[in-house]
């Protein structure tokens, strides 16, 4: 996935960390950085972890459509417009569109000390298709 701020125009991106194409807008405010992602049906990212010695993590805000986020070992949580999810650092998770609906969300990285992202395995089609 490429992320560039280009006069607020979206770039369509495809990357090994994301299933399906997605429109991405770069967002930056003070020490926070993030993406607004427009995700078509079946689009979701891989499992990943936002590492940080202190602080860090990620905030998800559903802008439109319907999507999911899931923490490893827990049930997936449906996201609808206005929903806000705070994911602490060191939590393995994924997020993306519902299997049958378009989804747009802000994914904001919370500033942290020695922060980094670790991209892991894809969410299997079998697991993903179980979502309704």
PLM segments and residue spans:
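Short, conserved beta-strand element in jelly-roll/cupin
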Residues: 38-41, 52-69, 108-111
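A short hydrophobic beta-strand segment most commonly corresponding to one strand
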Residues: 59, 86, 100-119
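Short acidic-glycine-tyrosine-enriched beta hairpin
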Residues: 73-90
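Asparagine-centered strand-capping/turn motif at beta-strand->loop junctions
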Residues: 96-97
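A short, N-terminal "cap"/entry segment at the start of jelly-roll beta-barrel domains
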Residues: 1-36, 41, 46, 116-132
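Short strand-connecting beta-turns/loops that link adjacent beta-strands
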Residues: 31, 54, 74, 100-101, ...
């Amino acid at each position: 996935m490429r992320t560039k701020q280009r006069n607020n125009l979206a770039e369509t991106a495809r990357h090994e960390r994301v299933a399906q194409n997605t429109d991405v807008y770069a967002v930056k405010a003070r020490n926070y950085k993030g993406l607004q992602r427009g995700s078509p049906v079946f689009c979701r990212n891989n499992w990943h972890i936002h590492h940080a010695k202190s602080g860090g993590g990620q905030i998800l805000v559903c802008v439109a459509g319907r999507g999911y986020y899931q923490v490893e070992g827990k049930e997936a949580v449906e996201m609808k417009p206005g929903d806000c999810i705070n994911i602490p650092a060191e939590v393995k998770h994924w997020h993306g569109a519902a299997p049958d609906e378009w989804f747009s969300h802000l994914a904001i990285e919370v500033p942290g000390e020695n922060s980094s992202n670790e991209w892991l395995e894809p969410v299997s089609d079998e697991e993903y298709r179980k979502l309704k």
